[in-house]
């Protein structure tokens, strides 16, 4: 028995499912979850001492690679000054200045501890600001485990084939209108009926929790126009894409040049440099509705934690244009190699891209929405995953999650991935239901 198996068996005696986040249990791919003891650069090391090239990157935060020396030094210095004060610190202002300097759509910023808190607060703020109750979301878009946003969510719910979550009341669910992604006509129709009651539309800037799905040309801009016409707000969820796909997130890649601006944005992952930090920001007049001077309450003991702020500041300072250029180039290189390997084995597939994020869908030619994502041949992913794992490459343990690269993925790391792809493609081709 491996050390990971022993640890997992013990963990199941202590924690639900043996994990603290469902996808880690390897439920959709089978086998034993790897218990990670350390990470450095592009590599993870498990409890059995085996190393893996990491294509999860902590689900996005490790843009620079694991244990980046500048981030570690900043965290050490912050720890020496104290772990938590329950008071404001200079580091909060420094990180806020960096975010506002990168994302012109953000005029005010509020720090929280998780992406779920950020989206939950953004929804509450939209309702408070507009005086309306209804929220529009899109099937397959994941916005954390907020009660009102769990309907037809992607990520772990897609992995577990769950339509929603038990414990969400009918009254809560009734205030969420779920539409197909990339369908502006459906948005226009729902506003024609409910426009005066809709507080906000929330969407992932580029969905990455039903696999990666790029918004159709004009889709996000259309959402901005429709919400503005009806006095509703547009909430752009950049928890995953923010500062990961570019210096200003996905909106910086597309929205600024297309001439549309969201009212609120949410951030997480990279903004905390690997520590529990997230944020929401946007129009000053909307953000000022938050307490202490506004009527919409939000608070958190660990919001703006000084150690997390230090990690975020160090990460954003180190995330230069060269870093994004390098990650973009590696992403294009790997997605092309993945497609070639699958084509060589005659496996129908679609490599889905948005910025430097990508994923693979089996048995379909394109994924534009959640219905397409669910129609793929998911049974091919588990053998593909385990073949890569056996070759020392750690992929997301779900076909519905994005693949991530970092600035630490050098030629040696990339060559290990390339060498593993042909066998994994053969395993996918041989898979049966």
From Swiss-Prot:
The protein's Enzyme Commission number: 5.4.3.8
SUBUNIT field: Homodimer.
Any single Gene Ontology cellular-component annotation: cytoplasm
Lineage, opening ranks: Bacteria, Bacillati, Actinomycetota, Actinomycetes, Micrococcales
Intracellular or extracellular location(s): Cytoplasm
Biological process annotations from GO: protoporphyrinogen IX biosynthetic process
PROSITE patterns in the record: AA_TRANSFER_CLASS_3
Name of this protein: Glutamate-1-semialdehyde 2,1-aminomutase
Catalytic activity: (S)-4-amino-5-oxopentanoate = 5-aminolevulinate
Assigned keywords, A-Z: Cytoplasm, Isomerase, Porphyrin biosynthesis, Pyridoxal phosphate
Species assigned in the record: Renibacterium salmoninarum (strain ATCC 33209 / DSM 20767 / JCM 11484 / NBRC 15589 / NCIMB 2235)
HAMAP family: HemL_aminotrans_3
Any one GO molecular function term: glutamate-1-semialdehyde 2,1-aminomutase activity
Keyword Cytoplasm found: yes
InterPro entries: 4pyrrol_synth_GluAld_NH2Trfase, Aminotrans_3, Aminotrans_3_PPA_site, PyrdxlP-dep_Trfase, PyrdxlP-dep_Trfase_major, PyrdxlP-dep_Trfase_small
Pathway: Porphyrin-containing compound metabolism; protoporphyrin-IX biosynthesis; 5-aminolevulinate from L-glutamyl-tRNA(Glu): step 2/2
Positions bearing N6-(pyridoxal phosphate)lysine: 269
Similarity section: Belongs to the class-III pyridoxal-phosphate-dependent aminotransferase family. HemL subfamily.
Statement: the UniProt record of this protein carries the keyword Cytoplasm: yes
UniProt cofactor(s): pyridoxal 5'-phosphate
């Amino acid at each position: 028995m491996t050390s990971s198996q022993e640890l997992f068996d013990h963990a199941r005696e202590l924690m639900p499912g043996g994990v603290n986040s469902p996808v880690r249990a390897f439920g959709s791919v089978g086998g034993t979850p790897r218990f990670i003891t350390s990470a450095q650069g592009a590599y993870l090391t498990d409890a059995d001492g085996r190393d893996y090239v990491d294509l999860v990157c902590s689900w996005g935060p490790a843009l620079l690679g694991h244990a980046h020396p500048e981030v570690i030094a900043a965290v050490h210095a912050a720890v020496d000054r104290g772990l938590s004060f329950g008071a404001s610190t200079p580091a909060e202002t420094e990180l806020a200045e960096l975010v506002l300097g990168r994302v012109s759509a953000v005029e005010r910023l509020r720090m929280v501890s998780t992406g779920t808190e950020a989206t939950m607060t953004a929804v509450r703020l939209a309702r408070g600001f507009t005086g309306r109750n209804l929220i529009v979301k899109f099937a397959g878009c994941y916005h954390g485990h907020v009660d009102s946003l769990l309907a037809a969510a992607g990520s772990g719910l897609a992995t577990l084939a769950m339509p929603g979550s038990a414990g969400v009341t009918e009254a809560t669910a009734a205030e969420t209108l779920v539409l197909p992604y990339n369908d502006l006509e459906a948005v226009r129709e729902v506003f024609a009926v409910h426009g005066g009651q809709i507080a906000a539309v929330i969407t992932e800037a580029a969905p990455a929790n039903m696999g990666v799905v790029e918004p159709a040309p004009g889709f996000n801009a259309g959402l901005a126009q429709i919400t503005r016409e009806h006095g509703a707000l547009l909430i752009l969820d950049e928890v995953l894409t923010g500062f990961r796909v570019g210096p200003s997130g996905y909106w910086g890649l597309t929205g600024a040049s297309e001439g549309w601006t969201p009212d609120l944005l949410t951030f997480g992952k990279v903004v905390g440099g690997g520590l529990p930090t997230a944020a929401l920001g946007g129009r000053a007049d909307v953000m000022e509705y938050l307490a202490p001077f506004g009527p919409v309450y939000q608070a958190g003991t660990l919001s703006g934690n000084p150690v997390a702020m230090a990690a975020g500041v160090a990460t954003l300072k180190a995330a230069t244009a060269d870093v994004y250029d390098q990650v973009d180039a590696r992403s294009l290189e790997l997605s092309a190699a993945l497609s070639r390997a699958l084509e060589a084995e005659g496996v129908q597939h679609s490599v889905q891209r948005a910025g430097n994020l990508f994923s693979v869908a089996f048995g379909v030619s394109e994924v534009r929405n959640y219905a397409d994502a669910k129609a793929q041949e998911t049974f091919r992913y588990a053998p593909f995953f385990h073949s890569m794992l056996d070759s020392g490459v750690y992929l997301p343990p779900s076909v519905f999650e994005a693949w991530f690269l970092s600035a630490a993925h050098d030629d040696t790391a990339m060559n290990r991935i390339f060498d593993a792809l042909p066998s994994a493609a053969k395993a996918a081709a041989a898979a049966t239901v």
